[in-house]
Amino acid sequence: KKLEPGTSLPSERFSLMQQLTERGITVIVNLAPILPFINDDMENIQGLLSYCVKAGVYGILTDKMCPVLREGNRERFYQQLYKNFPDIYDQYEAVYADEKTLKTKNYTEIMACIRETCEAHGIQYDKEELLRFTREYKNKTIGTQLSLFDMM
């Protein structure tokens, strides 16, 4: 929320996921970004996965989990980081100064937790399978104008 002002809270996203799945709408969550030293602790990851399980999501994508800082957004990211998280700014500089990809030190543990949770609850996490699903998903609303507000 601090780095991306205006974004909805996880609890708000959970509420929307529940509303969608209750209406039979397939939900795939893109679990990203996972930011080192900010939201990469296992308690946070397990909390996010718990939301997904409770909401009954179809799948969880993780291929964009590690942010890639390209020219332009790198400067903005570090400005926001310094402004909102000055206590960890130096850690980022020390660990990620020359890195484009912000891969958390917990990456392997996080991926294992995601895999175990998905397998235990029948949630799809294979990227290729999720992409295949989205390509083959039959649009049952052709010719119908939808509004997100009709669902609330």
Model segments located where?
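C-terminal accessory extensions appended to soluble enzyme cores
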Residues: 78-152
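Conserved AdoMet/S-adenosylmethionine-binding subsite of the radical SAM
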Residues: 1-92, 99
